[in-house]
Amino acid sequence: SAAALYGAVAANGAIMVTTKSSQSGKVAINVSSNTTVETPMVLPKFQNSYGVSNQGTFSWGDKLASASPNYAKDYYNLGYTTNNSISLAGGNDNISSYFSYANVSSNGIVPENTYMSHNLLAKVGFNLWTKLHVDVSARYNNQHIENQPTAGYVGNPTLGAYLFPRGEDWDYYKSNYEVYDGTRNINVHNWTNTAQEQFSNPYWMLNRQKPVSYRNRYE
């Protein structure tokens, strides 16, 4: 799978760009664009019989009067990825060239997860002598990623969505993910049992602990 080859950033798929060699002849222009839509394939099933425990951290407390909604389903968004590209190729018997630009824009299924990349490629080939041909190429890649999906227990906002105590008010904590701490004069994350610090409000992590990465690569 793409994730196995390229890691968590490719959890929703990877776009493979195969470059062409510079060509001689008439100028050829190619333009392409496509969009894919992503949704979770499988979600965990939750028990709906017992609510929050007496410590306010986990489920399996008192029996619930009615079933709770699937908070994990409410947590995910409808994701999409759009790929655009344009290329020009042409030349003559002595010199040929190929230029391309492509971008990928993605909003992941995890809230606040975005990915944007720009790719530029230029290749020129020319004959110096009858038996000597030279190819010169240059490539530039720019990436901007916010809230790249993570795995594991620490720093994973999805954990809070999966372990949120059954029967609690998910919408309240979604809208009020932080509260003011007068003893420290700062806003802190608001959760069912903040004192236990078992895991954090996912919306606090997504909005206040947002990892952002940039990359510029030249070849």
Residue ranges and their predicted role:
Residues 14-16, 83-85, 119-122, 139, ...:
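Membrane-embedded beta-strand positions in outer-membrane beta-barrel channels/transporters
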Residues 13-14, 21-112, 131, 148-152, ...:
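Residues embedded in well-ordered regular secondary structure
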Residues 113-125:
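Short secondary-structure subsegments characteristic of cysteine-rich extracellular domains
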Residues 105, 124-126, 142:
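Beta-strand elements of well-folded, non-transmembrane domains
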Residues 132-134, 139-142:
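Hydrophobic or amphipathic alpha-helical targeting/insertion segments
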Residues 1, 7-9, 13:
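Short acidic/polar hinge/loop motifs at secondary-structure boundaries
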